[in-house]
UniProtKB/Swiss-Prot annotation:
Molecular function GO terms recorded: peroxisome matrix targeting signal-1 binding
Keywords: Cytoplasm, Membrane, Peroxisome, Repeat, TPR repeat
Cell compartments where the protein resides: Cytoplasm; Peroxisome membrane
Family: Belongs to the peroxisomal targeting signal receptor family.
Ranges occupied by TPR repeats: 174-207, 218-252, 254-286, 288-320, 326-359, 360-393, 394-427, 429-461
InterPro entries: PEX5/PEX5L, TPR-like_helical_dom_sf, TPR_rpt
Protein role: Peroxisomal import receptor that mediates the peroxisomal import of both malate synthases MLS1 and MLS2 in oleate-grown cells. Recognizes the C-terminal peroxisomal targeting signal PTS1 sequence SKL of MLS1 and MLS2, probably via its TPR domains. Interacts with the PTS1-receptor docking protein PEX14 but not with peroxins PEX1, PEX3 through to PEX8, PEX10, PEX11, PEX12, PEX13, PEX15, PEX17, PEX18, PEX19 and PEX21.
Motif WxxxF motif: where in chain: 91-95
Lineage per the UniProt record: Eukaryota, Fungi, Dikarya, Ascomycota, Saccharomycotina
UniProt protein name: Peroxisomal targeting signal receptor 9
Length: 514
């Protein structure tokens, strides 16, 4: 709203009073834009070197890893960077390290700064300015000091009243105005979906097996699961195979281990944690389970538990080097270590000339410890070393994309995620990370497509009802559709009354997208 000035000629005393009041109506209804200058500093030469050297013997084409430039304001469709910075890219749930809102899995769209607001929104903020009391005591407080029969007021009251009416007319919005293009009717739905946690049951204390399992009668379902995993089959089928193996032999350590890892990769956090805990109950020093469970706790912002697990991982993996002294009790071993102390131990191990395989494991853990300690460059160097040594490891590409995304280098992060997706097409987690990166970049159409892929991948082979499908993926899909103003697709999703129709609707929406 433009600043309103009162033009009164002569040396009228009311003119002086009015000027003294300094009416600044432009402060009413003015909103600030949040702007964040993305840090896009990337070492292009290092990245190009990685991509150049990692292609040897690989059929996958070279990806141009360029430094991410700050996205143009027009590409954001009005969604502020500050809103989406709360979003857990989740470290692809591989490692999100800084404390954040635990509900940040759901991304919040915002309004364009030039969008018109509906009459209800206007009345909420400006209704107070219509009241007579406000007009007398706020707009022109000097009126209460003048009697109606004052000789001063009789001369200018008419002109004063006309200016006041003009001012109120500028504030006034007709009640019958409809702003259908903005889509505020969907904001209420967004407010319902943003807090989806109430729809989720409490975390179970025991692993939740599928009720129906096609592999339960097979002779060796564990072997079937390993073959499915190696061949890049749908992760739901891999989960069923390992669950069948455990049903036949509850003490199968490797089945529990692989089941936990696959559940994490399929974005089933609670079952993944429970499976790995069962593995550790059977084999307390299983280093693979310790590492993956430690990473999971970092994702859950439980840093103290993750540090305990990393400490135990070091003692278990390098037991010949670190042998507890006779006076060292269990309490001292379980004491929470400092990140810097653990990193120093691992750095010392690297200088001892250990085996190559152990070096890879140390660099993997160091990359996580460095990042959680906000040492971004050191973390990147660890991952870059691993990529040079293992260019076809999809998990490392996923983690590398995650660290780039958390430094807001979204273009480079998307390239890394796509590399991982090429190597592991069944990796549900990397598709979800891609969706989050696209949303942070402001590309809501691609984000919507990737979220639909995630939902369809996770629904394959499972018996779902519609209520169970209202998870964080569906909520983020709805928010992406709202942000892109694709309200027709949102209506189609809301109009699906059962799982079959919902899946068919999602496929139809996906095929219509550019």
């Amino acid at each position: 709203m433009n600043e309103v000035t009162c033009s009164i000629t002569g040396d009228n005393p009311i003119h002086k009073i009015n000027n003294g009041l300094g009416l600044k109506w432009n402060n009413l209804g003015k909103f600030s834009d949040f702007q964040t200058n993305d840090s896009a500093a990337r070492d292009a030469r290092t990245i190009d070197y990685i991509f150049t050297n990692c292609q040897t013997g690989s059929s996958i084409g070279k990806i141009d890893f360029r430094a991410a430039l700050p996205a143009d304001k027009s590409q954001h469709s009005g969604v502020s960077e500050k809103e989406f910075s709360r979003l857990e890219n989740q470290w692809s749930k591989e490692f999100s390290c800084f404390p954040k809102n635990k509900n940040a899995d759901v991304t919040k769209p915002s309004r364009n700064k030039h969008e018109k607001r509906s009459a209800n929104l206007h009345n909420r903020y400006f209704a107070q300015y219509y009241s007579t009391a406000y007009q007398q005591n706020r707009i022109y407080p000097c009126r209460i000091s003048y009697n109606e029969h004052s000789s001063v007021s009789n001369g200018w009251e008419f002109q004063f009243k006309s200016i006041e009416n003009q001012l109120l007319n500028e504030l006034k919005i007709e009640n019958n105005v409809e702003e259908k293009t903005v889509g505020y009717e969907y904001v209420a739905e967004y407010e319902e979906t943003i807090d989806f946690m109430h729809m989720l049951s409490s975390v179970p204390q025991t692993y939740q097996f599928l009720k129906s399992n096609i592999y339960i009668t097979e002779r060796d379902p564990y072997k079937i699961g390993c073959v499915l995993m190696d061949n890049g089959s749908n992760l739901n089928e891999v989960v069923m195979a390992f669950e069948a193996a455990i049903s036949q032999d509850p003490s199968h350590i490797n089945a529990w281990l692989k089941l936990g890892i696959v559940n994490f990769e399929n974005e089933s956090e609670s079952n993944g944690e429970l499976a790995l805990r069962n593995c550790l109950n059977l084999d307390p020093n299983n280093t693979i389970a310790l590492e993956n469970l430690a990473i999971h706790h970092i994702n859950q912002q439980n840093e103290s538990e993750s540090l305990k697990l990393f400490h135990k991982w070091i003692l278990s993996k390098f037991s010949k080097v670190f042998q507890p002294s006779a006076g060292e009790n269990k309490d001292s071993i379980n004491k929470i270590p400092k990140k810097a102390h653990l990193a120093h131990i691992l750095e010392s191990l690297l200088n001892m000339g250990i085996e190559k395989k152990d070096q890879y494991d140390i660099y993997s853990v160091l990359s996580i410890l460095y990042y959680s300690d906000q040492k971004i460059k050191q973390s990147q160097k660890c991952l870059e070393f691993l990529l040079l040594e293992k260019p076809n490891n999809g998990t490392i590409w996923n983690r590398y994309g995650a660290i780039l995304a958390n430094t807001k280098s979204y273009h480079s992060a998307i390239n890394a995620y796509n590399k991982c997706k090429q190597l592991r097409p069944n990796f549900t987690r990397v598709r979800y990370n891609l969706a989050i990166a696209y949303m942070n970049k402001g590309d809501y159409v691609k984000a919507s497509k990737m979220l639909i892929e995630v939902i369809l991948l996770r629904s394959k082979g499972y018996e779902h009802n519609k209520a169970k499908m209202q998870n964080k993926f569906m909520q983020n899909l709805k928010n992406a559709l709202i942000a892109s103003k694709n309200f027709d697709s949102l209506d189609l999703i809301n109009g699906s009354h059962n799982t079959e129709s919902l899946i068919s609707t999602l496929k139809a929406i996906y095929n219509k997208m550019d």
